[in-house]
């Protein structure tokens, strides 16, 4: 019997003549968790679509061996029958079907030729109980549940398919800390039962906790495979980016001027429960060239607050907004952009891009009037601007006219940043700007934020990553249960002090 459950040898893959994978090797033993590391666009997701059958045999080069025998899968049905199941970064749920229907989709139990819903619900509940998931009603539609709960439902679906190898692509990018904990504990249990796992994540603390082996790829090529016990986080980062990165937060001095933007008594109401406030009488000021971080627990009201300031919160809002001392009215994003306020949304795939449009057009869509002459677009001038932005943000794309959906998540995020920087904003709102982005791309985004601050742009940044908030902010607002719980200059500010304010413990207002 083979030592390895899965062995991939010399795997290559091309798209339109461009090499995405070039001679990659990967080995996974039963009961082992292999972490696949690399920058955005390195080829991690592309590589995992090979053994999972998304790319059938013949569309790639090399060899795959499964339980010692060569695997030539013609599609996902073949690989799932073998026991290889992938859970993509974008969850494959049917929102209006029940939890049980999603778990058994395509393999529904039947009686007399009809779907047996009682049996399906009972088996789904039993499956979730086996996974120690007791707070999900299998009869409810999936859309009732958070992204974290949906991730667990996807895992239950994989277990129902008798998975021997579970491939998880950025499983915790949109999860809360408690949801992440549940997922990590599940993976540890799976390993004890002999299930193997390939885990893709940019959160290197998770990598250290659950991985036995780390394989690093860069620009589609295999860089190294090492036992996790021999590596430190800086070692992994150096292999990923090809250079030593001593300081993740490249702080540079920048002048902070007069008040540029002011929000007074902002309140917002829940869309589904109009009697409940999600933002409750929040006021703050933002100065020219200042980086103002907004911290708080998930669900505290941070996204709701910044969405209202950009005119995208769908519920009722009230309060006043001032720009350079003058009151302004913002009812739509168009109003905000015209006033010099731009925003990079939390969910860039849903709210920030037009997936089937080219990368370049996604960048310039907010400033097309700049390239317009008598109603016609000057394509040459537009292309010059696009190429300049691609170089400035180091967006990895073979061609700016490729659909943006073909790019990795991190490169899509850079394109969204570019779109919101091209209008030359006075105020830039960033909601989770580095979510799902690798360490190298984070570093580039941080450098960009500091460069904008030096140019006098006022930056309002929401982040759930506390080191990020403390690493780049000049001042930190803390939101809890929709209220402003703290306003702290970032001098000797600690995670403990921010967390204490977020959960409602006494915290001194220091600004």
Swiss-Prot record:
Reactions the enzyme catalyzes: D-xylose(out) + ATP + H2O = D-xylose(in) + ADP + phosphate + H(+)
Domain of life: Bacteria
Cited PROSITE patterns: ABC_TRANSPORTER_1, ABC_TRANSPORTER_2, XYLG
Annotated binding of ATP, by residue: 38-45
Subcellular location, record wording: Cell inner membrane
CDD domains with a match to the protein in the record: ABC_Carb_Monos_I, ABC_Carb_Monos_II
A GO term from the CC aspect: plasma membrane
Pfam families: ABC_tran (PF00005)
Membrane topology: Peripheral membrane protein
Major site of localization recorded for this protein: membrane
Enzyme Commission number: 7.5.2.10
Domain ABC transporter stretches: 6-244, 261-506
InterPro entries in the cross-refs: AAA+_ATPase (IPR003593), ABC_carbohydrate_import_ATPase (IPR050107), ABC_transporter-like_ATP-bd (IPR003439), ABC_transporter-like_CS (IPR017871), ABC_transptr_XylG (IPR013455), P-loop_NTPase (IPR027417)
Signal peptide: none
Keywords: ATP-binding, Cell inner membrane, Cell membrane, Membrane, Nucleotide-binding, Repeat, Sugar transport, Translocase, Transport
Gene Ontology terms for molecular function: ABC-type D-xylose transporter activity; ATP binding; ATP hydrolysis activity
Similarity section: Belongs to the ABC transporter superfamily. Xylose importer (TC 3.A.1.2.4) family.
SUBUNIT field: The complex is composed of two ATP-binding proteins (XylG), two transmembrane proteins (XylH) and a solute-binding protein (XylF).
Record function comment: Part of the ABC transporter complex XylFGH involved in xylose import. Responsible for energy coupling to the transport system.
Name listed for the protein in its UniProt record: Xylose import ATP-binding protein XylG
Species the sequence originates in: Brucella suis biovar 1 (strain 1330)
Gene assigned in the entry: xylG
């Amino acid at each position: 019997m083979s030592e390895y459950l899965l062995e991939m040898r010399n795997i290559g893959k091309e798209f339109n003549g461009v090499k995405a994978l070039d001679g990659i090797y990967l080995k996974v033993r039963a009961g082992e968790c292999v972490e696949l590391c690399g920058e955005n666009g390195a080829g991690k997701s592309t590589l995992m679509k090979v053994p999972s059958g998304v790319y059938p045999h013949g569309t790639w080069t090399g060899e795959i061996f499964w339980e010692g025998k060569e695997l030539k899968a013609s599609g996902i049905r073949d690989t799932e029958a073998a026991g290889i199941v992938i859970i993509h970064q974008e969850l494959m749920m049917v929102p209006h079907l029940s939890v049980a229907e999603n778990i058994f989709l395509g393999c529904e139990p039947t009686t007399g030729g009809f779907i047996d819903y009682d049996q399906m619900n009972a088996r789904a509940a039993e499956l979730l109980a086996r996974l120690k998931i007791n707070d999900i009603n299998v009869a409810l539609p999936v859309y009732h549940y958070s992204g974290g709960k949906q991730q667990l439902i996807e895992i239950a679906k994989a277990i129902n398919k008798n998975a021997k190898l579970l491939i998880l692509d950025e499983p915790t990018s949109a999860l809360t800390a408690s949801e992440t904990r549940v997922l990590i504990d599940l993976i540890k249990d799976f390993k004890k039962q002999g299930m193997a796992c390939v885990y893709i994540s940019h959160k290197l603390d998770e990598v250290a906790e659950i991985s036995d082996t780390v394989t690093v790829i860069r620009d589609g090529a295999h860089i190294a495979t090492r036992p996790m016990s021999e590596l430190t986080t800086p070692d992994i980062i150096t292999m990923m980016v090809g250079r030593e990165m001593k300081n993740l937060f490249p702080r540079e001095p920048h002048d902070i001027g007069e008040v540029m933007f002011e929000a007074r008594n902002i309140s917002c109401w829940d869309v589904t429960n109009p009697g409940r406030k999600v933002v409750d009488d929040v006021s703050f000021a933002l100065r020219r060239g200042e980086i103002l971080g907004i911290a708080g627990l998930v669900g505290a009201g941070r996204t709701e607050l910044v969405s209202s300031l950009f005119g995208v919160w769908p519920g009722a809002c009230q309060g006043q907004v001032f720009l350079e001392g003058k009151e302004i009215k913002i009812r739509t994003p168009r109003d905000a952009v015209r006033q010099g306020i731009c925003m990079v949304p939390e969910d860039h795939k849903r709210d920030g891009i037009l997936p089937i449009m080219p990368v370049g057009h996604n960048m310039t869509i907010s400033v097309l009037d700049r390239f317009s002459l008598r109603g016609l677009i000057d394509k040459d001038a537009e292309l010059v601007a696009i190429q300049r932005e691609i170089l400035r943000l180091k967006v990895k794309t073979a061609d700016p006219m490729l659909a943006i959906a073909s790019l990795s998540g991190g490169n899509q995020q850079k394109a969204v940043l570019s779109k919101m920087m091209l209008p030359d904003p006075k105020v830039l709102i960033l909601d989770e700007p580095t979510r799902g982005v690798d360490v190298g791309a984070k570093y580039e985004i941080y450098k960009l934020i500091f460069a904008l601050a030096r140019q006098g742009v006022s930056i309002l940044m929401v982040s759930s990553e506390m080191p990020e908030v403390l690493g780049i902010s000049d001042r930190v607002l803390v939101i809890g249960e929709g209220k402003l719980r703290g306003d702290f200059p970032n001098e000797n500010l600690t995670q403990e002090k921010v967390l204490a304010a977020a959960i409602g413990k006494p915290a001194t207002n220091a600004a």
